[in-house]
């Protein structure tokens, strides 16, 4: 469970995972770096909230509903809702680079966190297997676009993602065997989404280089 903790006192500040990132974007601006992009612009908040609501219910949480379903009906309902929403999102992104407006917003970040795990984990481990992310041309290009944007792919550790799910969820994967695949080298392939326009960071600037101790090896180099 994500949480913000006051380190000196050890006191929990908040564990409201739905609000933490929004609070960071709106209430903690004094701690933002110079040039930090506005990921939750006030004129677009109603639309962002609406988009995020569907993404959370059917995609972010939907994969877990399918993966931890206790009955066939429960699984099939979650499965259907997941792919119905993914189809809607794919259609929305067919002619626009980002989910809301022409810059990256909180909605894109929340969708990315599930898309980046989809083929390595959710497709097999959670039985969300109608199709792979790589088989949806729009979502696959969109995910690669974000992955190749500073602040996204340079923080993704696919090896850790796979080990976490396959070794921790012993009720689903009792052998704790971690799959060798899938091939992840495609994440660095050209996406051509820049042709749709948009300004990734809006009036802000990209983040600086990842600190040496936090750098992740790109999949193509593994």
Question: Predicted segments — roles?
Answer:
Residues 1-222:
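C-terminal alpha-helical interaction module
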């Amino acid at each position: 469970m994500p949480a913000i903790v006051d380190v000196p006192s050890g006191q929990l500040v908040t564990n409201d995972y739905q609000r933490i990132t929004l609070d960071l974007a709106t209430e903690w601006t004094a701690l933002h770096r110079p040039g930090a992009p506005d990921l939750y612009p006030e004129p677009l908040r109603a639309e962002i909230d609406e988009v995020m609501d569907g993404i959370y219910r059917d995609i972010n949480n939907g994969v877990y509903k399918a993966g931890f379903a206790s009955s066939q009906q429960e699984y099939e309902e979650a499965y259907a809702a997941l792919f119905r929403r993914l189809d809607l999102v794919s259609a929305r992104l067919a002619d626009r680079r980002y989910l809301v407006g022409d810059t990256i917003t909180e909605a894109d970040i929340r969708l990315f966190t599930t898309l980046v795990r989809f083929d390595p984990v959710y497709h097999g481990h959670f039985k969300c297997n109608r199709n792979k992310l790589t088989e949806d041309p729009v979502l696959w290009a969109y995910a690669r676009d974000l992955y190749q944007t500073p602040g996204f792919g340079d923080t993704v550790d696919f090896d850790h993602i796979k080990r976490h799910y396959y070794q921790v969820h012993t009720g689903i994967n009792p052998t704790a065997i971690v799959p060798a695949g899938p091939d992840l080298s495609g994440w660095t392939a050209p996406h051509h989404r820049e042709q749709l326009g948009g300004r990734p960071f809006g009036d802000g600037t990209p983040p600086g280089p990842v600190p040496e101790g936090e750098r992740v090896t790109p999949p193509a180099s593994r």
